[in-house]
Amino acid sequence: MKETRPIIALDFAGKEEVQSFLEQFPPDEKLYVKVGMELYYAEGPGIINYLKDCGHSIFLDLKLHDIPNTVESAMKVLAKLGVDMTNVHAAGGVEMMRAARRGLGKDAVLIAVTQLTSTSEEQMRTDQNIQTSLQEAVVHYAQRAQEAGLDGVVCSAHEVALIKDATSSDFVCLTPGIRPTGGEVGDQKRVMTPADAARIGSDYIVVGRPITKSEHPYQTYLSIKEEWNRG
């Protein structure tokens, strides 16, 4: 089921910056936010508790990639935190992903990273020695994630249709690298607008700097939300 709220990437160095940012939103505006490595490693589980107390939904973006036993144990800890969504690297393999599913349980959405949106096909071939096309590699990872019992994948909007054709229509596709119409691309190499992502079938979108660096974050958020839901 499509999430109507764009997920806001809280790419900040600490809690004070997060608080200053969230103060620009109405207190009753319940957001869906992404906590990544920088913020989580700086603040620890306390930042999750703070955001939950504010009533926000949380995608904890740590991209776990380790041996199955370690990942399963880590996921048990994340399950106790009560996050709404988290992820692993599909490159860790089916057994690792199955272990992640066991550890997290069924109450939270578990997705796998296929290829980072900053990765080009040339980089994939040179750095990872994967000689298929980028799209073929992404679809393969998505199929392995589905086999492992995950709910979906992180992928570029350019691959959503291919992934759903290769898996199922209810296999979740979360799309980062979203930029509003007319926005700067930044360091993302495979990007789309919110409307494009909606039309192509994305279930979740993640938006960071266009909102967090905006002079008027709440108005920008509402504009992106409207474009996403109108798409």
UniProtKB/Swiss-Prot annotation:
GO MF terms listed in the record are: orotidine-5'-phosphate decarboxylase activity
Swiss-Prot/TrEMBL GO biological process terms: 'de novo' pyrimidine nucleobase biosynthetic process; 'de novo' UMP biosynthetic process
- Its EC number is 4.1.1.23
UniProt pathway annotation: Pyrimidine metabolism; UMP biosynthesis via de novo pathway; UMP from orotate: step 2/2
Q: Where is the active site?
A: 63
Q: Which InterPro entries match?
A: Aldolase_TIM, OMPdecase, OMPdecase_AS, OMPdecase_bac, OMPdeCOase_dom, RibuloseP-bd_barrel
Q: Name one GO cellular component term.
A: cytosol
SMART domains, alphabetized: OMPdecase
Catalysis: reaction(s): orotidine 5'-phosphate + H(+) = UMP + CO2
Q: What Pfam families does its record include?
A: OMPdecase
Keyword terms: Decarboxylase, Lyase, Pyrimidine biosynthesis
Q: Which residues bind substrate?
A: 11, 34, 61-70, 117, 179, 188, 208-209
- Establish whether keyword Lyase is in the entry: yes
The UniProt entry's sequence similarity note says: Belongs to the OMP decarboxylase family. Type 1 subfamily.
Subunit info? Homodimer.
Free-text function comment from the UniProt entry: Catalyzes the decarboxylation of orotidine 5'-monophosphate (OMP) to uridine 5'-monophosphate (UMP).
What's the name of the protein?
Orotidine 5'-phosphate decarboxylase
Provenance organism: Streptococcus suis (strain 05ZYH33)
The upper taxonomy is: Bacteria, Bacillati, Bacillota, Bacilli, Lactobacillales
